[in-house]
Amino acid sequence: MKAYLILEDGSVYEGENVGACREAVSEIVFNTSMTGYLEVMTDPSYAGQAVVMTYPLIGNYGICYDDMESYRPWIDGLIVRELSEVASNFRNEDSIQNFLIKNNIPCICGIDTRDLTKRLREHGTMNGFITVDSSFVVEKILQRIKEYSVKDVVKRTSTKEAYILPGKGKRVVLIDFGAKKNIARQLQKRGCEVIVVPCDTKAKEILKLKPDGIMLSNGPGDPKENVDIIKEIKKLYDTDIPIFAICLGHQLMALATGANTYKLRYGHRGGNHPVKDLETGRTYISSQNHGYAVDESTLDKNICVPAFVNVNDGTNEGLRYINKKIFTVQYHPEACPGPRDSSYLFDKFIKMMED
């Protein structure tokens, strides 16, 4: 069956439908990872977005459910050059096509993803419409496509109830803004007791749990939407509790301390982004998934200073807070998918809680 992707600039891509037979309007973004498509599909940070995989062959190692980064996939759609009909992997439990259909996710294959990615790079991230209905009239659906925006996705992806992951070491409260599983896994691996709480948990309730440290997780959407959450984070900043923040959490902490954020032209999504540690001069290859960044020109240097920078485009990738046990990074040290070069940051957080 034919499937179509119509972008808000009026361009149309034709391919084959290999997923669920439904329409979807979404923000179209691209990911440059060669592997890790299941982790991408189940990363809550992609809520409200359809993902173009730039690597030309997807699905060749199937689906292993243990690799999921959430209890369900969050993408609105998947766009690939070629979907493998054969999965060769001793861990394989399902085909990617079955996974997409079971989870009602549309997928287009057979389109020129190089051309599509080039268009998104040149013109910036765009909204798009995925459909199997060939009777569409571009002029009639453009307004609907342009009006779409990613809204209210943090509450949708966050846990609704607090829960505890046992450990005998330090107690860490993980505020779930759409947290990937591997964040908690990395903390448990280091012996921590992890208490995962909903995104809208009040600071006073978090303090009642007597945490040794607090983690602000990754998550989807525009950080500025989360006005009430930002107010609670400011209250946590005013304590002496060690705080480690990742991705959206990094942006929220920056906003809570008076800085600004802005939308990137086409974002950073993939497992091959170089970031430079400004203190040591060392460069790490990182896993990234964000469409917004902290504006360094708005930082109060009496509060925080840049700690990491993106080697490719010079955007901020981390902050160090003055006279506070707080550090934040824009990228994903927990990886999954991607390199584990920066997993040492979890060790740094543990040491910070012990000091």
Residue ranges and their predicted role:
Residues 106, 171, 242-244, 260, ...:
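Proline-centered loop/turn at the N-terminus of a beta-strand
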Residues 17-18, 55, 288, 311, ...:
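Short clusters of small/polar residues that mark proteolytic maturation junctions
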Residues 282-324:
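Catalytic beta-strand/loop cores that center a nucleophilic Ser/Cys/Thr
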Residues 318-355:
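A glycine-centered loop/beta-turn motif at secondary-structure junctions
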Residues 213, 217-285, 293, 338-353:
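Cysteine-nucleophile active-site neighborhood
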Residues 112, 247, 290, 332:
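Active-site glycine-centered loops adjacent to acidic/histidine catalytic or metal-binding residues
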